[in-house]
Amino acid sequence: MADQEPTHHLNPWHTRGSREVYVNPWIRVREDHVIRADGNDGIYGVVEFQNYALGVVPVTDDGDTFLVGQWRYPLGLYSWEIPEGGGPLHSLPLDSARRELAEEAGLSAASWTDLGLFHLSNSVTNEVGQIFLAQDLIFGEPTPEGDEVLALRRLPLLEAHAMAMDGRITDGVSIIGLARAVHFLGL
């Protein structure tokens, strides 16, 4: 018999208590005392993000896109990514997407398409992300934040998509964004 989607989804976890372990302006870490899905007592560590994540796939009229290169401190490696960042939970994601595209790539766009939400590391975080497609681009100069040393690369969208599919791009926001953009555009 084929796997079937349950007709209802009940939370099998029960939270008995919670304590804050760490907090800074970007994250809050809590430890929950739980009754697990198997009925046993346990603990569960959760990282709550104070911002949402977002990514922008800018596409030119001739089918090119832009990747941003930067050093990612937590991973200890250089990463090519779509323009991405975050925004305060109380702000509009499109406003933050416009800001990130201008800061990182020096671009603005006359046409924006919401390509949907996604969850990052949903086994340990509540982080939610959103992807946008930016078209009808207007070119300017990047204005990165003080702690960002960025490189900008223009290449065909399908080449960037191939990089995401074959592992040359490993950033999750970029992989999701490039896959959704190519799908949306029917390429």
Language-model features: locations:
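Nudix hydrolase/Nudix homology domain
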Residues: 2-13, 78, 89, 114, ...
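Short helix-loop capping/hinge motifs at secondary-structure junctions, enriched
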Residues: 64-65, 138-140
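Acidic, metal-coordinating catalytic segment for phosphate/diphosphate chemistry
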Residues: 16-55, 60-61
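The catalytic Nudix box helix
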Residues: 67, 81-114, 132, 144-146, ...
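Conserved hydrophobic "DFG−1" position in protein kinase catalytic cores
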Residues: 34, 58, 67, 133-134, ...
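Conserved Nudix-box catalytic region and its N-terminal flanking loop in Nudix hydrolases
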Residues: 10-12, 47-50, 55-99
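Acidic pyrophosphate-coordinating catalytic loop
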Residues: 20-24, 73, 118-128
